[in-house]
């Protein structure tokens, strides 16, 4: 029995499905006191709201796709916290010992879907289209192994560099928060969810690889413990998914994968924000705001990120985006997020202590501050 009898929970959740296959959330409110909800509430939490647990099983996960008509696997109230378990790629078929030939077959036999396994969706009571959902990452505990691989000649930014493919497995020392890449070379662990987001507006089943306004497969290495994802809501209940667990990754994710793993636990607090209206997701760290842009063309992704950053600065300083645009190059650090998710990503990091004035003050004396 894993946390609770999941079969009973999913059976109870099935009563939420309305006549003719239409989701009940399109017709009437859903109570957080449902039978399924009570099964998933656990006592003894130090985090905000009720505490829930959602394990990763074949009943609570999907392999490589989003669908906003998917039955919720958990219903929570705004402000509640969920400890979520995740699976490795391809419904748990990535694990130490798998050969690169086996991993390649998982991609070539299932080309229409992404490789990531997604736990969810989670329905958040009170979330409506036009709202913003705040998802704070409270805690991440990876499993004790990770993998980095390239499918032979097929994927990644530089497939020709790996014509035969490669896979390497690692032991993750969660106490030291490191892994040994080679004798004498240690890589610090910095776990984050590669995929975290809400249901897209469009009905139907979509490949989960490309990110978008709904967030999703951001692959942003700065979405770590203590940060909050702010994402616009497109369907009632938001419908939150999490997966594609990473133990570490560099900006760009240039060889297709980061240090791929699965999470024993990722603990998220979800809060509905009725006041903030967003068109694209943002990440809040203790010291910075991160704005994002996506496009198949990296230059256009940068332009989108720059526009979002100017919009953010304009909101903060109460000026027009045109006035804020020159500040982007002065106050923001723009980085390539990833180049492997069909739609490439660029993100710009802006200090919470953004410039106090858009106008540079007139100097009172000639100093090295102005001339060298």
What are these regions (language model features)?
Residues 191-217, 221-299, 310:
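Conserved mixed alpha/beta catalytic, RNA-binding, or beta-rich assembly cores of soluble enzyme
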Residues 18-20, 24-26, 32:
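Boundary at the C-terminal end of the N-terminal hydrophobic targeting segment
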Residues 89-100, 140-150, 237-247, 337-340:
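Short, Lys/Arg- and Gly-enriched loop/turn segments at beta-strand edges
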Residues 7-20:
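Bacterial N-terminal signal peptides
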Residues 34-37, 41-110:
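N-terminal, Lys/Arg-enriched amphipathic/low-complexity engagement segments
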Residues 116, 139-223:
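Intrinsically disordered, low-complexity linker/loop segments enriched in Gly/Pro
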Residues 57-67, 111-119, 206-214:
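Short, structured beta-strand/loop micro-motifs enriched in basic residues and often containing a Trp
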